[in-house]
Amino acid sequence: MQRSPLEKASVVSKLFFSWTRPILRKGYRQRLELSDIYQIPSADSADNLSEKLEREWDRELASKKNPKLINALRRCFFWRFMFYGIFLYLGEVTKAVQPLLLGRIIASYDPDNKEERSIAIYLGIGLCLLFIVRTLLLHPAIFGLHHIGMQMRIAMFSLIYKKTLKLSSRVLDKISIGQLVSLLSNNLNKFDEGLALAHFVWIAPLQVALLMGLIWELLQASAFCGLGFLIVLALFQAGLGRMMMKYRDQRAGKISERLVITSEMIENIQSVKAYCWEEAMEKMIENLRQTELKLTRKAAYVRYFNSSAFFFSGFFVVFLSVLPYALIKGIVLRKIFTTISFCIVLRMAVTRQFPWAVQTWYDSLGAINKIQDFLQKQEYKTLEYNLTTTEVVMENVTAFWEEGFGELFEKAKQNNNNRKTSNGDDSLFFSNFSLLGTPVLKDINFKIERGQLLAVAGSTGAGKTSLLMMIMGELEPSEGKIKHSGRISFCSQFSWIMPGTIKENIIFGVSYDEYRYRSVIKACQLEEDISKFAEKDNIVLGEGGITLSGGQRARISLARAVYKDADLYLLDSPFGYLDVLTEKEIFESCICKLMANKTRILVTSKMEHLKKADKILILHEGSSYFYGTFSELQNLRPDFSSKLMGCDSFDQFSAERRNSILTETLRRFSLEGDAPVSWTETKKQSFKQTGEFGEKRKNSILNPINSIRKFSIVPKTPLQMNGIEEDSDEPLERRLSLVPDSEQGEAILPHISVISTGPTLQARRRQSVLNLMTHSINQGQSIHRKTTASTRKVSLAPQANLTELDIYSRRLSQETGLEISEEINEEDLKECFFDDMESIPAVTTWNTYLRYITVHKSLIFVLIWCLVIFLAEVAASLVVLWLLGNTPLQDKGNSTHSRNNSYAVIITSTSSYYVFYIYVGVADTLLAMGFFRGLPLVHTLITVSKILHHKMLHSVLQAPMSTLNTLKAGGILNRFSKDIAILDDLLPLTIFDFIQLLLIVIGAIAVVAVLQPYIFVATVPVIVAFIMLRAYFLQTSQQLKQLESEGRSPIFTHLVTSLKGLWTLRAFGRQPYFETLFHKALNLHTANWFLYLSTLRWFQMRIEMIFVMFFIAVTFISILTTGEGEGRIGIILTLAMNIMSTLQWAVNSSIDVDSLMRSVSRVFKFIDMPTEGKPTKSTKPYKNGQLSKVMIIENSHVKKDDIWPSGGQMTVKDLSAKYTEGGNAILENISFSISPGQRVGLLGRTGSGKSTLLSALLRLLNTEGEIQIDGVSWDSITLQQWRKAFGVIPQKVFIFSGTFRKNLDPYEQWSDQEIWKVADEVGLRSVIEQFPGKLDFVLVDGGCVLSHGHKQLMCLARSVLSKAKILLLDEPSAHLDPVTYQIIRRTLKQAFADCTVILCEHRIEAMLECQQFLVIEENKVRQYDSIQKLLNERSLFRQAISPSDRVKLFPHRNSSKGKSQPQIAALKEETEEEVQDTRL
């Protein structure tokens, strides 16, 4: 960054903001970069501001029982705030004085006051000086208040972040990431620009009192008629505001539904295309959009009338003020024009300034109170440690994550045990964790000496992580004692990578020791990985380490923990993402050798680790199931250990699979069972349909108290994203950082908010910060958005001046129309993270405007209609001017004096009432035309938004995956949320305001030109100057806003990153370092924002200066060239004041339109995306309520045979595939043939291309070559018809928000009887029947109430309903329990007995059922043969599979000679037989 010119700027340069000229000049000539931005003044640095506020807040905490944050803010900023407030008041006072001078100038042209004609020139000078003084007072005052607001925001930003790092885990479990981000964005943003409004809470009443006194002098008691009307108008607008809020709240739910479906569609676009659901999803979203638009129109109409009421209230205010006085005493024109000027200022004070000031104080105090409550939350308390101790001891320790929930948990458990019925499923496999109670540890006792290894095992949710958290102090024990030295190192179950180099992530602030560093790198098997990078360990890792694989991230996290020299190492499942060989090597070299003399607590479910541990602690439901050595485990729990040991392949299973087996074993041999139970009996009981699970599931949904989730770290299924291989391990951070979780309202809420709507009961969950830290969220997590129309805070009144525009309307371009709730503004959340679609030109092109206007043909006619109405209004204005200036009337009190044609006095004789009738009639006509002129325009612009949304949705659904792969999900969702909200809410009224302001300016100039042609000559160069100044400023301002948006992203990214690694930060004591990084991010954003505010003030002040020069010219031209007659000079000066203030407003409004039109540009960019495959001849799947043929098949063979494919024979010739056009081939020359009904297994190492081949068969990639199914080539039929030939069970399960019926049959092709039949076949009937509404039960949140196994069965049911002849399965058994796995195997044998099956699977027992195997190595087919030939050790088969697969496939070669076959096979067969009599 460059050194700021502000530091050396003179007082004059600071006053006129001339120091910003270099950046404006550079931005106009070239594109600005971050290096061009000026450094911030030291007074604005986050370090200084946070230290200042933190000192005052600590003082407040120490001195009072009820500390108030506002007191700390007052001591920091109050006097500067009041200083600028006084300047603002003085500037407002000048606005009240100006009409007095205007009245004196008009009076000097009265024929009876010729003696005052000589002082008219001096009055004109005084009037011009008032404009100059107002300019010099208001702009520095407004900028100073904005500056103070910015400093307050920065200080509170830092205070909140520091507090976040200190919060206890219990508090973090109650606060969502959405609430935290909202606290930093939505609430604190109120201070930046709203602070200038705060002073009007006292300025406006003083101004009203002053104005009423001046108007009283002119009109006496009739002045209160106008004031009364303004008060009624304010109340009327408040009523409209409440009506608008009602429509907004109704509309919010509809927008939320649409965005939920849209976000799920975007996240699972590959599955949507694989299922051929594009048209079903489009129809579903468009139906929701139709309902939403009905409420959008109602809200827009109310906002329009609210805005129009202000526009046209000026006439009534003047008319009601003048009429009573005129009827009684008569009135001169001087009083009319003076009253007009007074009423303009009065109207702004009563209907705008004061209500907005009250609202600003209300919002600001509410935000301060929320922040104050947050700053007083319970903090993390480190346990009292004994630095001299060498052992780790726990004595009778009991703990709850929810304070005070112990008794509630026991009561809820007892209640549910009393309500057991016989209609449910007791299998724990389907829930993965208990749905009851809080995570709890009960009566834990153990003692480990220095240098010992304690292995902690247990089923999912048993309390293993909670145990480590209690040792770290994150979880406070409610009973018992904990003893250790306090020097702890920690490795989280889910690897956390901070932005920085690999070396920085491992050292993590600890002093560098070369020998220790190299030893750790070697022990953690990172040497080979680091050597592959050109920068070695100095390579910079992105957010969350997205450039690394899951295994690399896990090893770096482990290396970080090992590198720190500590007394106690807490390792929470560090091997989750490692293959068998790497895991074994790291355990031996690192855990057992390098750390041999250290005390270690290792959470693991691997039998090999239990054997080598000094002590073993097995947890079950929070209690100690066993504590002792491995030999004691074998002696005391022979059944437990023998069952695990009997599975020779147990150690080779994935962590999830081991957890599943361990869970079931623990259940069968729980301490609760007093009597011995045989294996067979226990197994049968475990699969018996008792109804306990069903009742628990219902209670967990229907009863919020029973739905307190159990804290457990549930490993996520590796995501398959955009056709990448199955272990691509799409990092969770990429989704969470872009789309923060939504949350309703208050800081502390129940864990589940339940919305029950009869049969369509919906259970919605949120993601707390603690969930974010543990990543224990549902895979199908969707984005809940509650979108509402933004309330127009600004009505662009033509009478308003520059200052009013600046204070009240600059926020226009930042208003969003998006909210999740009153607490969380979704637009603020979205703007917290930089949008990669912002790579559009800085200024909207004319082509965008032309395309926008021609989207809907009616828009052109509506614009013509607006022009016709405008011409009629100009004619009406000329009639009014004729009445005011050219009607010969007589004064009631001076009827004896003769007058010429320019008599300026109106009398109230009976004959003269007709003048008022004409005036009122013309004004009413003008008012009516004005009220309804913009209504067709607003209506049509909303229709344009509807059309653009439809086109964009269709374009995204039809776009090829190669295009969608290059876009972030958050960026796509921004178009459907942020940009569509702008098109719906902001753009229509902003365009209407701009057109109206522009036409008003043109009309007023035309009137003035008729009255005084010389003024028209002066107007032309002023308009040219405005246009040039706008173009000059716009280039720089848009770029600065872009840089500011980019600078905002690191702040919130750093917040999310810190929260994810908070336990690690605390364990390593790195909070100060991360506070420093946060302050750097704040300073970067401040530099951009401060420069934007400064350049904006430069622009506003230059506009004001041009206006002042113009008004000086108009004043002196009028005084010097106008003859006798008050009417002419009064009209000229009054219109001149309004012309220029309106022209300023029009210029600024055009900038707002340009800014909002960037959203239109982004929408057009999506509409112009390429379309995949051949266009279909029929794009409407529904006709007259019935499903029509979606695709017209062009192949003659298919036309003759309605049932295609009939056999399922597939021939692949020279198939090659690429992710993007021009990219590297990821599959090369793949050729093979499959006979009808044959099963083919795909084998190969991770990353060899197995899942990619399945995507290529579905034509989801850029492919070359030929594929034929039953003799029909894929080039001869349409794309969707080709995909309908396949049934798909993807690795990433897709459950969208909707009913069971919609999820199974989105096109509504099948009857309920057929759906229930398929549900019976796949074992889903009992699952569906336990929910209210059954098939009509609404699934939300990615089907959060279903287990992963249930979701896989849903996918299986879809394939059965599709009646496809070719089935593609991509890891269907990943993370499945044995029961669901056996159901899928059974269904495949029965329902797909005659189908061709292509299976990508890691479970060997499933692969052995295939007749042929396709071995893929290095993106090519290495072998395609039967299993008998592949078993030959000299074949390429053994080279193509991983070592772990080799162990599974050849168990007899890897076991001892006397060892029998794995008992897991027997278990599999017994389970399969049992399943025949068990419905799930």
From Swiss-Prot:
Residues 1470-1480 have a biased composition (Acidic residues). Binds and hydrolyzes ATP via the two cytoplasmic ABC transporter nucleotide-binding domains. The two ATP-binding domains interact with each other, forming a head-to-tail dimer. Normal ATPase activity requires interaction between the two domains. The first ABC transporter nucleotide-binding domain has no ATPase activity by itself. The PDZ-binding motif mediates interactions with GOPC and with the SLC4A7, NHERF1/EBP50 complex. N-glycosylated. Epithelial ion channel that plays an important role in the regulation of epithelial ion and water transport and fluid homeostasis. Mediates the transport of chloride ions across the cell membrane. Possesses an intrinsic ATPase activity and utilizes ATP to gate its channel; the passive flow of anions through the channel is gated by cycles of ATP binding and hydrolysis by the ATP-binding domains. The ion channel is also permeable to HCO(3)(-); selectivity depends on the extracellular chloride concentration. Its EC number is 5.6.1.6. InterPro entries: AAA+_ATPase, ABC1_TM_dom, ABC1_TM_sf, ABC_transporter-like_ATP-bd, ABC_transporter-like_CS, ABC_transporter_C-like, CFTR/ABCC7, CFTR1_ATP-bd_dom1. This is Cystic fibrosis transmembrane conductance regulator. Belongs to the ABC transporter superfamily. ABCC family. CFTR transporter (TC 3.A.1.202) subfamily. CDD domains: ABC_6TM_CFTR_D1, ABC_6TM_CFTR_D2, ABCC_CFTR1, ABCC_CFTR2. ATP 2 binds at Y1219, G1244, R1245, T1246, G1247, S1248, G1249, K1250, S1251. Keywords: ATP-binding, Cell membrane, Chloride, Chloride channel, Endoplasmic reticulum, Endosome, Glycoprotein, Ion channel, Ion transport, Isomerase, Isopeptide bond, Lipoprotein, Membrane, Nucleotide-binding, Nucleus, Palmitate, Phosphoprotein, Repeat, Transmembrane, Transmembrane helix, Transport, Ubl conjugation. The gene is CFTR. GO terms for biological process: bicarbonate transport; cellular response to cAMP; cellular response to forskolin; chloride transmembrane transport; intracellular pH elevation; membrane hyperpolarization; multicellular organismal-level water homeostasis; response to endoplasmic reticulum stress. Residues 1-77, 147-195, 244-298, 359-858, 940-990, 1035-1095, 1152-1480 are cytoplasmic. A lipid is attached at C524, C1395 (S-palmitoyl cysteine). Residues 423-646, 1210-1443 form the ABC transporter domain. Monomer; does not require oligomerization for channel activity. May form oligomers in the membrane. Interacts with SLC26A3, SLC26A6 and NHERF1. Interacts with SHANK2. Interacts with MYO6. Interacts (via C-terminus) with GOPC (via PDZ domain); this promotes CFTR internalization and thereby decreases channel activity. Interacts with SLC4A7 through NHERF1. Found in a complex with MYO5B and RAB11A. Interacts with ANO1. Interacts with SLC26A8. Interacts with AHCYL1; the interaction increases CFTR activity. Interacts with CSE1L. A motif (PDZ-binding) lies at residues 1478-1480. It is a multi-pass membrane protein. Residues 1386-1480 are annotated as: Interaction with GORASP2. The keyword Lipoprotein applies. The modification Phosphoserine is found at S549, S660, S670, S686, S700, S712, S737, S753, S768, S790, S795, S813, S1444, S1456.
